[in-house]
Amino acid sequence: AYVDSPDITTYTELHNSWLEAYINWQYVEMFNIGKAEEIMFFSKTNTYPVNEGRIQENINNEKTDLSNPNDWSCQGFPGLDYMIHGIADSENEIINQYIQNPLNGKYLKVVINELNDNTDLVLNDWNTYRNTFVNSVENTATSAFNMLTNDFVYYFEKGLRTNKIGIPSGVFSNNPLSNKVEAYYSSKNGIEDVSRDLIENALNAVDPVSYTHLR
């Protein structure tokens, strides 16, 4: 609706849908197994910070194939954050960008469709893979249980503590790096400051018992 009729009402609806989906993502991001691992779902869905210059090139070139690893930072929830909140400095200016340049709307659709298609692949595969996964409890490197455990530990240390908290807060540098948070553009341009909300949901998604053992 927004691409066909960009105004403040459809813009707000788009923002709210993006935020709801991004919050939900926090609860599944650590499960990088099966089809998700095969298609690099984690990287395609939540690589940040985005590559602004490459996104603009993709827009101008009307690019529709985002399978190149160099385009991981041009799609997913961070890519949508830029397209919804970052191509100008205010809601009205952003809406005008879509009115004046239809290529922005075309690329927004490409990013949304890519995310939806990848999600469908993972969900459809899970419907057939679930029983195999549940019954795979052997103590081997390729058993589902061990893979799940290893992926969870990796996510906890790298995806959560390092990427979501450590790097933006400046733990690994002399100063905080605010541009390396999730939802950077929504917060930066005053649309809605949701970066903290995403981190809090990511922490809530981590099982308290596992957190106690891993910290």
Tell what function each PLM region has:
Residues 212-213:
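Conserved small/polar residues in nucleotide/adenosyl-binding loops
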Residues 8-11:
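N-terminal secretory/targeting leader peptides
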Residues 1-4:
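N-terminal mature-domain "stem" immediately C-terminal to a signal peptide or N-terminal signal-anchor/transmembrane
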Residues 192-204, 208:
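Long, repeat-rich segments with strong aromatic
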Residues 21-183:
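Acidic/His-rich structured neighborhood in mature extracellular/periplasmic domains
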Residues 185-189:
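Glycine- and acidic
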